[in-house]
Amino acid sequence: MASPAPGAGFQNKNRVAILAELDKEKRRLIQNSSMNNPGASIPLSRPALNKDFRDHAEQQHIAAQQKAALQHAHAHSSGFFITQDSSFGNLILPVLPRLDPPPPAES
């Protein structure tokens, strides 16, 4: 086996020292930035773009599910249904007619 060159160990230690110094400086800059601008951060990716794309695809999927559920309900029920956003995750909601209360009974 070939032995490493005599200066290789020194170069490696020098690299490690430089990288440690750069990391320390980076942490200091990030800390100063967050102190000067609370709530500000450096985005490392573009999650908003991906989230918007996912939300749009999810909306289309839900719309297709709502349409299918509505068609199924109208075909298999005598009631009337509408598509409506629901707090409980229902895709469609039944529409119930309002009936006038019966007149008071005379005695």
UniProtKB/Swiss-Prot annotation:
Localization: Nucleus
Pfam families in alphabetical order: SOSSC
A GO term from the CC aspect: nucleus
Keyword DNA damage: yes
UniProt KW Lyase keyword: no
Coiled coil: none
Main subcellular location of this protein, as a coarse class: nucleus
GO BP terms in the entry: DNA damage response; DNA repair; response to ionizing radiation
Keyword terms, alphabetized: DNA damage, DNA repair, Nucleus
Domain of life: Eukaryota
Protein role: Component of the SOSS complex, a multiprotein complex that functions downstream of the MRN complex to promote DNA repair and G2/M checkpoint. The SOSS complex associates with single-stranded DNA at DNA lesions and influences diverse endpoints in the cellular DNA damage response including cell-cycle checkpoint activation, recombinational repair and maintenance of genomic stability. Required for efficient homologous recombination-dependent repair of double-strand breaks (DSBs).
Protein family per UniProt: Belongs to the SOSS-C family.
Binding partners and assembly: Belongs to the multiprotein complex Integrator. Component of the SOSS complex, composed of soss-b (soss-b1/nabp2 or soss-b2/nabp1), soss-a/ints3 and soss-c/inip.
Listed name of the protein: SOSS complex subunit C
Organism placement in taxonomy: Eukaryota, Metazoa, Chordata, Craniata, Vertebrata
